[in-house]
Amino acid sequence: MKVVAFERSVQGTGASRRLRNAGKTPAIIYGAGAEPKLIELDHNALYHALKKEAFHSSILDIEVAGKVEKALLRDFQLHPFKQLVLHVDFQRVSATEKIHVKVPLHFLNQETAPGVKLGHGIVNHILNDVEVSCLPADLPEFIEVDLGNLEIGQTLHISDLKLPKGVTIVTHGGDENPAVANISVPAGEVSAAAAESAGEGDKPAA
């Protein structure tokens, strides 16, 4: 994904405000052993790019003064109530060094899963993204999660995911195999079943 940027030589609150008033957004590129570079981007193009999933999880080609640098979006600041991007951070990547990036999950075959189609269950997305470790060339835009065989009451875990070659999942918090999604019984049906069971328990013995 290509991003066109321009070098900027001034920084500070006043300079950033003037940039924003001119329809630009201040940004910085850092990392990969090179000096940080101050840049500016067209605000409207950036604002629309931030709405795209791939902008957050892909290697970006940032063109500055005719030179392209490969980088990841690492952070961005939004105005608390205006549709305004205040600042953006990009991190350079090296082709030979592994990166850690959060990648979105795309859930497939939810409607045809046995637990939904036959059991009338509800799909619960426990995770919507996962952190992966890989070389920049191996970074996937997303990871597919196939729910096509999931029965009611079953849970899909990280270990069940089919990962692209060269990609591993990074887990935190001590749980090495967290749940990704499950299919549960609708709350109304659970309540009805519980009430029916309680009613049967209240019947006098014959």
From Swiss-Prot:
GO cellular component, one term: cytosolic large ribosomal subunit
Gene Ontology terms, MF aspect: 5S rRNA binding; structural constituent of ribosome
Database matches in SUPFAM superfamilies: Ribosomal protein L25-like
Source organism superkingdom: Bacteria
Signal peptide annotation: none
Protein's GO biological process: translation
Keywords: Ribonucleoprotein, Ribosomal protein, RNA-binding, rRNA-binding
Subunit structure of this chain's protein: Part of the 50S ribosomal subunit; part of the 5S rRNA/L5/L18/L25 subcomplex. Contacts the 5S rRNA. Binds to the 5S rRNA independently of L5 and L18.
Protein family (similarity comment): Belongs to the bacterial ribosomal protein bL25 family. CTC subfamily.
Classification via PANTHER family: RIBOSOMAL PROTEIN L25/GLN-TRNA SYNTHETASE, ANTI-CODON-BINDING DOMAIN-CONTAINING PROTEIN, RIBOSOMAL PROTEIN L25_GLN-TRNA SYNTHETASE, ANTI-CODON-BINDING DOMAIN-CONTAINING PROTEIN
NCBIfam families reported in the protein's UniProt record: bL25_bact_ctc (TIGR00731), PRK05618.1-2 (NF004128), PRK05618.1-5 (NF004130), PRK05943.1 (NF004612)
Primary role: This is one of the proteins that binds to the 5S RNA in the ribosome where it forms part of the central protuberance.
Protein name: Large ribosomal subunit protein bL25
Organism for this UniProt entry: Ralstonia nicotianae (strain ATCC BAA-1114 / GMI1000)
